[in-house]
Design a protein with these regions (language model features):
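Positively charged, small/polar-rich N-terminal and surface patches that mediate targeting and assembly
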Residues: 1-105
Length: 105
C-alpha cells in the first residue's frame, strides 16, 4: 500500500490543531504534525495577501486520499485551501505498516 504525505497551511494554531485532531480521530490520517507559524504571501482576488499560517503535515494511505481531501476542504477556512502531496521515494517498512494500521477504522 502506498503511503502519502499531505500538506496544507491553516491560519491560526487553534484552528490547525482542531482540524488535525478531527482528521486523525476519523482515521483519515495516522498522524498530523502542526508546525510553527509561517508567513504566507500570495495573490487572492487581485490583491497581494500576507497571512500567518501553520503548516500541517498528515501521513496517510493512498486509499484515503480522496476522503482526506474532502474532509480537509470541508473544514478548512479558505475557499481554495492549499492541499499538496510531496512525492515520497520510499517509506521505511515498520513506519509504513504503522500508518496502514492506524488508518483502519
Amino acid at each position: 500500500m502506498k503511503i502519502l504525505i499531505v500538506q496544507t497551511n491553516i491560519p491560526g494554531q487553534d484552528v490547525a490543531v482542531k482540524i488535525a485532531e478531527i482528521i486523525v480521530e476519523k482515521r483519515l490520517a495516522a498522524c498530523a504534525n502542526v508546525l510553527s507559524e509561517a508567513t504566507s504571501i500570495y495573490w487572492w482576488e487581485k490583491k497581494l495577501q500576507r497571512e500567518i499560517e501553520h503548516p500541517v503535515v498528515f501521513k496517510t494511505t493512498e486509499s484515503l486520499k480522496d476522503s482526506l481531501i474532502k474532509e480537509l476542504r470541508a473544514l478548512h477556512p479558505h475557499d481554495v485551501p492549499e492541499i499538496v502531496f510531496p512525492k515520497l521515494e520510499d517509506v521505511e517498512e515498520t513506519y509504513a505498516n504503522l500508518i496502514i494500521q492506524e488508518t483502519k477504522a
